[in-house]
């Protein structure tokens, strides 16, 4: 992990996340890449746990992603093994062999099938996974099951992250108290669909696999698929949601079951919390940017415009420089390829209307917006004036520190 | 123009470009934004000049782009007026009015129709064009026609450029000697389709408008549409090719006329020369990167992969840091959304095969590639192993200087 101090946008502290019934965590230091820190996480899950996953759309997906995509179709999981420091990506047949070996190792210890062991890896691409190191610490990892905290788990999966990321919410399904708790990592190579971003969310709710899959996809779409740090899509992006069923709530029948309303909201809050923490740890980030797009022809078009703004290096550097260069926002809207009529386009920053229906508003004074830009939370609102489509997208600014981190990451 | 020293990748000197029969140039300092430098260029063209243009695909195209797109359909031009410092983009009705006013002013002086006057503007977006300043220097501009050099013309159209860009070639159509000469500007907001990039190329050849249009599009596709600096698409990108016909060669009938072979090659050389100069002046560039993609299912797919690599901030920062982080190249290939089979993928840098058919080659030693990366001209070759499609794409690295320039551009 490069020697970088904590992001100025980091939350003040890691939340006090309660346990999730049925989930037992363990961490270990295998020395895969990093020295003197935990880099392995194992989560054991009880029988009957349902699981859903969303993975990178990269054409060069990592071996663990290929493994998980194949195995999560069962909708079941008994364990989750995660390592940091090595992505096991672009490692050919050996990479697939190493995943199978790891899953089998966990399966034996937990008396389940290898297919029930989900695996995720994050770190350098193209280097073989040093499985012998994992092998050495494996007995200890198994022996420690149940002893690790969420904080330790969140730390073990980090790479260039400057702080561990966790979130939780309590909610109800019917009259049953439910806990939703999650951890995530990610700070660079962050873009939707998805990012070098791993997110693992655990709930004790009882949710059938098909329902869990729908809820998870819809939630990821409004959280991790609405963030970008640098527009680069990783080989390893993984979001996994597991439900242990230990809360014994009445089983919902579909995603539209009214009993799920409170749960879906809690889940979305956990995902948005984790996703925005990833952005707040965006490599070199000094400002957190929320972009609201309204008046698009559809929600999809709105997100397209939002992401075009969020991914523009020129918008992001202007904000880093606290420069109210709103012309670059117009440029980014233009390049989005979404339907746009510049005569109807309005742009605001920090709640101040700068341009309305195709031109700068009369009497616009930059000083108020400049004031807003000196803060660390920046708001951009774009109204396309075409329809009812809307989306909210989050990103961070592009600073010298991003360059420093990424020009020095591997060496 | 921010106080930045000349790009380390700049050519040693501006070429000694000969005159093009029929083209008369003038420059003037209107003080649109910059002080004490020329910011207006006028090129007068003789009757019978044919013209072709390619413009930004931005949904928020500038007023001059809208004007040119409408008027170039005639295939004729009598003048070209260019200003730097203000893009006249997102300026509403007033912007269109200002273009019409400028064109009419030139048309009166040259006794032609306003529709024959092509206009281009580059600079800040969203601020009204200060036409009164142009008005003041206008008589002088007309009076100076024929007195400006290519060097002066190339300098007058620059914004954040650290050096003026020009190129020329001589060739033959039949037995007639032909000159092709061009100037360009651009250094940021550079991406294909196109970039804040203006290119104006002039030839004395006699080419019917329809043929000129085809030749121009094909040439832009293999030059300006194969470069990227920061993936941002400008509101103002313009490439215009004019042919004065003064060389009186036999008129070619189609783009496939054999007499054009030599001319097409010369034209492509001029465009690639200008396009790569734009990349070499990429904001903050310290390394010039040539990416060859082979084995794609089509040339279009190859270009898509090449641009995904060229636009990846993680690839560009790694190269800035002289780090042979080829895993990021694999990541970028994966995110391109072109057809990819990672089992067939090979990656080389500086001619050294690093990964072959889906994994790192046995015995690969990074030190040779590291050596290559210390140079200023970097070569990346990717073979997808799928077909005969190929493309060459150019970009530059992403450095601290990019951030510095763009966080401070406007203020």
What does each model-identified segment do?
Chain A
Residues 2-100, 107-411:
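A structural signal for small-residue-enriched, beta-sheet-centric alpha/beta enzyme cores
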């Amino acid at each position: 992990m490069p020697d970088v101090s904590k992001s100025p946008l980091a939350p003040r502290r890691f939340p006090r996340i309660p346990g999730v019934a049925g989930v037992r965590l363990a961490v270990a230091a295998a020395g895969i890449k990093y020295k003197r820190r935990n880099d392995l996480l194992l989560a054991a899950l009880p029988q009957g746990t349902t699981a859903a996953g969303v993975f990178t759309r990269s054409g060069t997906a990592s071996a663990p992603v290929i493994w998980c995509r194949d195995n999560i179709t069962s909708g079941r999981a008994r364990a989750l093994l995660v390592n940091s420091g090595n992505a096991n990506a672009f490692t050919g047949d050996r990479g697939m062999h190493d995943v199978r070996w790891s899953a089998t190792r966990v399966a034996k210890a937990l008396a389940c099938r290898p297919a029930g062991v989900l695996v995720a890896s994050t770190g350098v691409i193209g280097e073989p996974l040093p499985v012998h190191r994992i092998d050495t610490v494996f007995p200890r990892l198994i022996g420690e099951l149940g002893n690790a905290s969420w904080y330790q788990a969140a730390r073990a999966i980090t790479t260039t992250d400057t702080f561990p990321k966790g979130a939780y919410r309590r909610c109800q399904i019917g009259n049953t108290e439910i806990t939703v708790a999650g951890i995530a990592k990610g700070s660079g190579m962050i873009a939707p669909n998805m990012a070098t971003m791993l997110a693992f969310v655990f709930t004790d709710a009882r949710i059938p696999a098909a329902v869990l899959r729908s809820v998870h996809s819809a939630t990821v779409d409004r959280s991790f698929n609405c963030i970008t740090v640098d527009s680069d899509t990783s080989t390893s992006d993984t979001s996994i949601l597991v439900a242990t069923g230990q809360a014994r709530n009445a089983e919902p029948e579909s995603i539209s079951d009214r009993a799920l309303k409170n749960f879906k909201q809690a889940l979305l809050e956990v995902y948005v919390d984790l996703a925005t923490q990833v952005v707040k740890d965006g490599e070199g980030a000094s400002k957190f940017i929320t972009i609201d797009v309204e008046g698009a022809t559809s929600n999809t078009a709105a997100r397209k415009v939002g992401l075009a703004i969020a991914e523009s290096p020129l918008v992001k550097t202007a904000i880093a420089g606290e420069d109210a260069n709103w012309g670059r926002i117009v440029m980014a809207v233009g390049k989005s390829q979404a339907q746009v009529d510049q005569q109807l386009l309005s742009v605001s920053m920090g709640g101040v209307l700068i341009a309305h229906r195709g031109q700068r508003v009369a009497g616009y004074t930059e000083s108020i917006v400049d004031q807003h830009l000196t803060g660390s939370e920046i708001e951009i609102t774009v109204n396309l004036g075409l329809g009812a489509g809307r989306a909210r997208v989050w990103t961070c600014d592009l600073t010298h520190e991003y360059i420093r981190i990424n020009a020095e990451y591997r060496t």
